[in-house]
Amino acid sequence: MSQLELETCNLTLVRYPQVAENSALQAWDAADEYLLRELSTMEIAPGPRLIFNDTFGALACGLQAQSPVSISDSYLSQLATRHNLELNGYDADAVTLLDSMADLPDAPALVVMRIPKTIALLEHQLRMLRKVVTPQTRIIAGAKARDIHTSTLQLFERVMGPTKTSLAWKKARLVHCEWAELKVSEQSLTTEWELDGYGYRIQNHANVYSRNGLDIGARFFMQHLPEQIDGKIIDLGCGNGVIGLAALEANPDATVGFFDESYMAVASSQMNVEVNRPQDVERCSFVVNNGLSRVRRDTLQAVLCNPPFHQLQAVTDEIAWQMFMDARRCLQVGGELRIVGNRHLDYFHKLKRLFGNCETIASNTKFAVLRAVKTNSSR
């Protein structure tokens, strides 16, 4: 829990999932503060206020009196926004939450953006914005100064119009942009590549990890998946769904759920099943969710996971640990959690502590595939 002190208000903000009280990680940074400070000096005409990529709701809380629309690809960010609005005594419904695949309101008066780390997502959002903004729309973006590159500014200018940057303040910088009459060609930001050994054509929306090819951890994991399971399998943190696709093929009597907190990831997974295994769509579910939070206890036969070891730019195992605990809760006795992870992360001892058992299925110089089974003693 941390305090963001502004001239107009003081905000209490927490990360989501929440971290230990003594953690140095906080729910806002200097870019949030700089944006809110700058906005407090601007006169904005009536019209929709759009917020993009508000990580934990700092911008939504600071602008809640203006009934903004907050657009994010992250379900966790949306949960954090609602939680922090309520934590500060605001009406959570004062802020409209839209996912990254939704249509945007027309003619916004203001666009406030946290510049995303993924350049493809930034281009997707700028192209979506170009369809709805007007010459009168005020567009302001922010990020840590080290994350705003020449290529970032060139992208704003190429897609939107004249762009300038502010002076750095607390190691953050702002980008001011104006709409201009430009010839911007239509371009799909969905990538496509062939999954070797399977004959699948994999498509990826802009914010999906490893969007230009199969990452080496997933490739290793796919060689060591469980087979002939008759029950419910979850591909947890599914990304583009390649693990779930392989699980569908190896387990013809199972149902497979594709779960991720990214709207674009779940949409990519659904697209890839529909294109590559249309006969198996009825065996699948596609769910945007916080881990397995909406899954009933003792209902799953297997959980497959390539867990993240960072949230935004912070290295943390909080999300991975939550995934492991969710799996233990939702697995049936005898059901298994199977993961792949970098060897240096030492997931083996974490899983053994949580489940009471863990075995190494396979390993190489960089990755290990681990299996933990739920027993009566690990309920």
UniProtKB/Swiss-Prot annotation:
The record's listing under SUPFAM superfamilies reads: S-adenosyl-L-methionine-dependent methyltransferases
What enzyme category does the UniProt record give? transferase
Could you tell me what this protein is called?
Answer: Ribosomal RNA large subunit methyltransferase G
Highest taxon of the source? Answer: Bacteria
InterPro entries hit by this protein? rRNA_m2G-MeTrfase_RlmG, RsmC/RlmG, SAM-dependent_MTases_sf, Small_mtfrase_dom
Keywords, sorted A to Z: Cytoplasm, Methyltransferase, rRNA processing, S-adenosyl-L-methionine, Transferase
Which EC number(s) does UniProt give? 2.1.1.174
In terms of HAMAP family, this protein maps to: 23SrRNA_methyltr_G
Give TM regions: none
Q: What does this protein do?
A: Specifically methylates the guanine in position 1835 (m2G1835) of 23S rRNA.
> Catalysed reaction(s)?
guanosine(1835) in 23S rRNA + S-adenosyl-L-methionine = N(2)-methylguanosine(1835) in 23S rRNA + S-adenosyl-L-homocysteine + H(+)
What family name appears in the similarity comment?
Belongs to the methyltransferase superfamily. RlmG family.
GO CC annotations?
Answer: cytoplasm
GO MF terms held by the record = 23S rRNA (guanine(1835)-N(2))-methyltransferase activity
- Report the subcellular localization: Cytoplasm
Q: Which organism is it from?
A: Pectobacterium atrosepticum (strain SCRI 1043 / ATCC BAA-672)
Q: Name one Pfam family in it.
A: MTS
The record's annotation in PANTHER family points to: RIBOSOMAL RNA LARGE SUBUNIT METHYLTRANSFERASE G, RIBOSOMAL RNA SMALL SUBUNIT METHYLTRANSFERASE C
